[in-house]
C-alpha cells in the first residue's frame, strides 16, 4: 500500500526514484475504495488445492477481495466432485455481462497438446477475448500464459524434450517498475511445464515487455504495454509439496521424470523439499493486485477506461 505524504514534499522525488509507492494527500483524499472483484478460471485438475493456493496469495494483502470461481461449463472435472463444482463455480454465461477488477487464469496439464487440439480451446479463446473488454487486469499462469500469448499475439511455444520442473533463479531486467517493487535483484520461482516461449521473440514484440527472466527457465514475468495482461510462465502459487506430488505422480505413471531441480534438500528426492519462493510469489500477486488492479480499476466497474498516474510516466 502507498505511503501518504504532503503535496510537494521533497522526499517524494527521491522515494519515487527508488521505486517506493507514495501518494499525495490530494490524490489520497479523492481516492474511492471498495472491495476488489476477482474472477478465477481454474483449469487445474485438483480444483480445491488450486483454489486454496490462489486464495492464500490473494488473502495476503491489505485489500478486501471478493472472489468468483469460473469453470468451463461443458468440461467434466475428474478430480473434483460435481457437488463442489455446482455449489461454488459459475458458468461463463453467468458472468458474461459483468465486469471484474481482476481475472486469474490458471495453468493446465496440457503442455504437450497443440492449442487448437484442446477440447475446450474455443471456450478459452472466448474468455480471453471477453477479458480484454470486461476486466481491468488479467493474470495468466503457466499454460494459460502460453495460450494467451499465442491467441493475443500469435506467438508460438517450443516443446521441450523433457519436462522443466524445479525452482530456478530469476533476475529483474528492469529496476523501476511497479510490479517489481520489493523484489530482490535475484529471486527463486517454481516451474512445471513441457514447453517454453522464446525469450528473443518476447523481447522483440513491440506490445510486450519482459520484466524478469532466468538463464535456465527463460522468461518468467511478461507484461503487455497496455498494462492489462500479465503473463507468468511459472507457478508462484505452488505450495511446498506440489512439485513433489507431481514428481511422484509422474513416476507412478511410468513417465520417468527428472528430479525437480533445486527443490529437494541436497537435490535428493528421498529428502523433504525446501520452499524458497513463497515470499516472492506472495509479493508478485500483491503487487499485481495493488498496482495493476486496485490503482488502475475504476470505482464504477461499468467504466473500464481509467488509468493511474504512474501509467502516464511509462
UniProtKB/Swiss-Prot annotation:
This is Homoserine O-succinyltransferase. It is found in: Cytoplasm. The record marks 111 as: Important for acyl-CoA specificity. GO terms for molecular function: homoserine O-acetyltransferase activity; homoserine O-succinyltransferase activity. The active site is at 142 (acyl-thioester intermediate), 235 (proton acceptor), 237. The lineage of its organism: Bacteria, Pseudomonadati, Pseudomonadota, Gammaproteobacteria, Alteromonadales. InterPro entries: Class_I_gatase-like (IPR029062), HST_MetA (IPR005697), MetA_family (IPR033752). Substrate binds at residues 163, 192, 249. Belongs to the MetA family. GO terms for cellular component: cytoplasm. CDD domains: GATase1_HTS (cd03131). The record marks 192 as: Important for substrate specificity. Gene3D superfamilies: 3.40.50.880. Transfers a succinyl group from succinyl-CoA to L-homoserine, forming succinyl-L-homoserine. It is an enzyme of class 2 (transferase). Its main location: cytoplasm. SUPFAM superfamilies: Class I glutamine amidotransferase-like.
Amino acid at each position: 500500500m502507498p505511503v501518504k505524504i504532503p503535496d510537494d514534499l521533497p522526499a517524494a522525488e527521491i522515494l519515487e526514484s527508488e521505486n517506493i509507492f507514495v501518494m499525495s494527500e490530494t490524490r489520497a483524499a479523492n481516492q474511492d475504495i471498495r472491495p476488489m472483484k476477482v474472477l478465477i478460471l481454474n483449469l487445474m485438475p485438483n480444483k480445491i488445492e488450486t483454489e486454496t493456493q490462489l486464495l492464500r496469495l490473494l488473502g495476503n494483502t491489505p485489500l478486501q477481495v471478493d472472489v468468483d470461481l469460473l469453470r468451463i461449463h461443458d468440461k467434466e472435472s475428474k478430480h473434483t466432485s460435481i457437488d463442489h463444482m455446482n455449489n461454488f463455480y459459475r458458468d461463463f454465461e453467468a458472468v458474461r455481462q459483468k465486469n471484474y477488477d481482476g481475472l486469474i487464469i490458471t495453468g493446465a496439464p496440457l503442455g504437450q497438446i497443440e492449442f487448437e487440439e484442446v477440447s475446450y480451446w474455443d471456450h478459452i479463446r472466448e474468455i480471453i477475448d471477453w477479458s480484454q473488454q470486461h476486466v481491468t487486469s488479467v493474470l495468466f499462469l503457466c499454460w494459460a500464459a502460453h495460450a494467451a500469448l499465442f491467441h493475443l499475439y500469435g506467438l508460438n511455444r517450443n516443446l521441450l524434450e523433457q519436462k522443466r520442473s524445479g525452482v530456478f533463479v530469476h533476475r529483474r531486467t528492469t529496476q523501476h517498475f511497479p510490479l517489481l517493487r520489493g523484489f530482490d535483484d535475484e529471486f527463486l520461482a517454481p516451474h512445471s511445464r513441457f514447453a517454453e516461449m522464446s525469450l528473443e521473440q518476447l523481447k522483440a514484440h513491440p506490445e510486450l515487455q519482459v520484466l524478469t527472466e532466468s538463464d535456465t527457465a527463460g522468461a518468467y514475468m511478461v507484461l503487455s504495454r497496455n498494462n492489462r495482461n500479465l503473463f507468468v510462465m511459472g507457478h508462484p502459487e505452488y505450495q511446498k509439496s506440489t512439485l513433489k506430488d507431481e514428481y511422484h505422480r509422474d513416476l507412478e505413471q511410468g513417465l520417468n521424470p527428472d528430479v525437480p531441480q533445486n527443490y529437494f534438500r541436497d537435490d535428493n528426492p528421498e529428502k523433504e523439499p525446501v520452499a524458497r519462493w513463497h515470499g516472492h510469489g506472495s509479493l508478485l500477486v500483491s503487487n499485481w493486485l495493488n498496482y495493476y488492479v486496485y490503482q488502475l480499476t475504476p470505482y464504477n466497474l461499468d467504466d473500464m477506461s481509467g488509468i493511474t498516474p504512474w501509467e502516464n510516466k511509462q
